[in-house]
Amino acid sequence: MIHTDYIRLNRILAALTFFISFFVYYDTMASTVSYWDCGEFIATSYTLGVPHPPGSPFFLLLGRIFSLIPINQDIAFRVNLLSPLSSALAVMLLYLVVVKVVTHWRGKIENSTDAMIAFGGAVVGALAFAFTDSHWFNAVEAEVYAISTFFTAIVVWLILLWSEKADESGHERYILIIAYMMGLATGLHLLNLLALPFIALIMYFRKYSFEWKSFLATVGITGVTFFIIHNMIIKGLPKMAASGLGIGGTAVIVVAVFASTYWAIINKHNLLSVALTSMVMILIGYSTYTTIFVRSNQNPNIDENDPETVEAFVSYLEREQYGSVGTFPRRYKGIEPIHEVVGRPEKGRDFSPRQEREYMFYNTSKQWDYFWNYQIKKMYN
């Protein structure tokens, strides 16, 4: 909590962190098309085309809006502007998050010393994050990561705001807007789902005292929630439509969820109504993915994978074109392969699962050396 004498100062400093980071990002922003996926995202935003799987449809809609703002002749410049703005907002939200964490730890801000510690620490922390290599890099080009970071930041801030007001009437509204934000974020990048454990732990420690039984139950519920969102909504609904259920059967299931939510609200089943309404909000946010299906049927100039049928759309969401590679064994140089994969055991008797396991864990220390020296130190320094 913040004493009323310092609320205005808190708002000024929050705005200051936003403007400082925004002006730096704007000044260093790519003035036109840059490398990697940026050109693709700019072109598909401007034309509402279909980019590479899994699509990022919400980014395309926002990019389309920014492409219509008459501030520069270069369309790429207009779409690029989305990243500095969302990145600066993420920095501002980080400032507000740090203030809430510090005040929760130290207590209410009542004098200048409290204000200096909370506000000063938040400014330093937010600006330190603002100028980290990864965030700054994402903030100056048309990519999904900048706005995905913003959505993660706003979800974290909202759950901390809920924690302050959890004993007040109507606190459920914060949970519902978090669910909606997470639904929208699925149309950007699935990174936002990683905030689920944090949200669950904040809710748990705000409402309960620590006990292993209740803590493990919370962890289990969090896992089930993640499974429902990722496997049953994001990936499951399109698969249902592609299966025997068809689009009509899938629509019936969605309508049933809405009807169940209405029933729970009318009959004042508070916990059930919040859970079902949260699911509805996620579904509404996730509905941005219908734009991929709709636009592909219009055959835009950029129509990657042509996901205009339900089956093709499922393949598009599943990223099937990329294939799959296991995490182990790690790819590194320095030793000779100790076996050659010759196919399934019944076709090649010289290969067995035991050999695969031995190869996977062969010289583990050298695998970790490669991971640390190349994939961490070289890529991030």
Model features per residue range: what roles?
Residues 44-47, 125-127, 174-188:
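Membrane-interface alpha helices of multi-pass inner-membrane proteins
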Residues 15, 81-110, 153-158:
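Transmembrane-helix motifs of polytopic, lipid-linked glycan transferases
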